[in-house]
């Protein structure tokens, strides 16, 4: 990565200043808009736990981003987002943030599956030529891929059901109060979170396209 940095810098120097500034300005706007979408998700998720204004939800997202930069594998993001909640709701907020992350992961898997379907002819040929895989093995691979994505979709829809079952398990019984906010999540909210996550993914995609144009 460091070896490619001089090449990247030299390529930036060949771009007219006005064009580069315009691209960077648009990229910055997209980033702010993306955080706004995530703030909307957080506002909707915490509504029954602790109603937040959009401004407070946006501040929570920025706090989560700041904490995640100083943590390993961004694990501090959930903690950072919950820091602006009241004392009794912070741990519940951390649990809720995993639902937001699950909705984003769901969309990422779906778009990945769409990419596999779109690239199927060339991907299928490359796997056959380079890895010498038989048709049976490839069929099993594609079948497992579809199955796992489908299973994740079902698990996402059933998050309230699993939370309810876990809260009654002996080991999790003492932590049942943390799962209470998830048990009552309506399915339409889970769908709404997935749709907003899809919009975030499209914004990410546009940002990458703009970067490739630099």
Annotate each language-model stretch with its function.
Residues 63-71, 95-117:
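Membrane-embedded alpha-helical segments of transport systems
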Residues 58-84:
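Extended non-transmembrane interhelical loops and adjacent amphipathic helices
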Residues 54-59, 88-102:
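Membrane-interface alpha-helices at helix entry/exit sites of multi-pass transporters
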Residues 1-61, 118-214:
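Predominantly cytoplasmic-facing regulatory/coupling regions of multi-pass membrane proteins
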Residues 81-85, 103-106, 116-123:
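Short alpha-helical linear motifs
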């Amino acid at each position: 990565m460091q070896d490619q940095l001089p090449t990247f810098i030299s390529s930036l120097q060949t771009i007219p200043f006005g064009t580069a500034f315009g691209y960077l300005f648009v990229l910055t706007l997209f980033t702010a808009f993306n955080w706004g979408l995530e703030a909307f998700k957080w506002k909707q998720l915490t509504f029954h736990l602790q109603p937040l204004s959009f401004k407070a939800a946006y501040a929570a997202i920025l706090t989560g981003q700041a904490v995640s930069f100083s943590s390993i594998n961004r694990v501090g993001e959930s903690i950072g987002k919950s820091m602006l909640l009241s004392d009794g709701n912070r741990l519940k907020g951390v649990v809720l943030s995993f639902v937001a992350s699950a909705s984003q992961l769901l969309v990422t898997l779906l778009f990945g599956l769409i990419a596999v379907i779109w690239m199927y002819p060339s991907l299928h040929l490359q796997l056959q030529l380079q890895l010498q895989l038989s048709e049976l093995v490839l069929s099993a691979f594609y079948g497992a891929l579809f199955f796992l994505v489908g299973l994740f979709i079902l698990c996402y829809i059933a998050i309230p059901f699993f939370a309810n079952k876990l809260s009654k398990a002996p080991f999790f019984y003492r932590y049942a109060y943390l799962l209470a906010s998830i048990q009552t999540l309506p399915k339409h909210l889970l769908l709404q979170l997935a749709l907003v996550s899809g919009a975030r993914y499209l914004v990410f995609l546009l940002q990458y396209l703009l970067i490739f144009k630099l």
